[in-house]
Amino acid sequence: GCFQMIRFASRRMMKQRYGRIINVSSVSGVAGNAGQANYCASKAGMIGLTKSAAKELASRGITCNAIAPGFVKTEMTDVLSDEVKENAKKQIPLGRFAEPEDIANAAVFLASDKAAYITGQVLLVDGGMVM
């Protein structure tokens, strides 16, 4: 998964002395969630991997960051009941789920030269749900 991809991609990036690695974790990896210990642990592990890779690869011109989305309008959230969706939205200061484009825009930013001095960070894209 994530570890193998970093290993594979970083080899070429090291030769170029430039690269951007962007992992997609979850707010659950930051804050946890009752009943989802396995999912939360895997996403928290990805955050730890991101930070370690950032430290290992920075001297070679490679940044490594993670995006941690909250609720996003996808097939995964479409199956939730209206009651669950409304309760979730009450926990989000912006009062809505993210659009997939909101997550994509965060990735585009982290991949850009405007994020050249950002590494080892977790960018929460969650409408303020975790702060």
Question: What is each residue range found by the language model?
Answer:
Residues 31-34, 108, 119-131:
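Short C-terminal tail/terminal secondary-structure segment
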Residues 26:
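Residue(s) in the substrate-gating loop at a strand-loop-helix junction
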Residues 31-37, 59-60, 95, 113:
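Active-site loop immediately N-terminal to the catalytic Tyr-X3-Lys motif
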Residues 66, 89-114, 118, 127:
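C-terminal helical subdomain
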Residues 47, 68-78:
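Short, flexible catalytic-loop segment of classical short-chain dehydrogenase/reductase
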Residues 11, 55-59, 116:
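Alpha-helical segment proximal to the catalytic Tyr-Lys
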Residues 6, 42, 50:
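Active-site helix of classical SDR
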Residues 1, 32, 37-45:
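The catalytic Tyr-X3-Lys active-site helix of short-chain dehydrogenase/reductase
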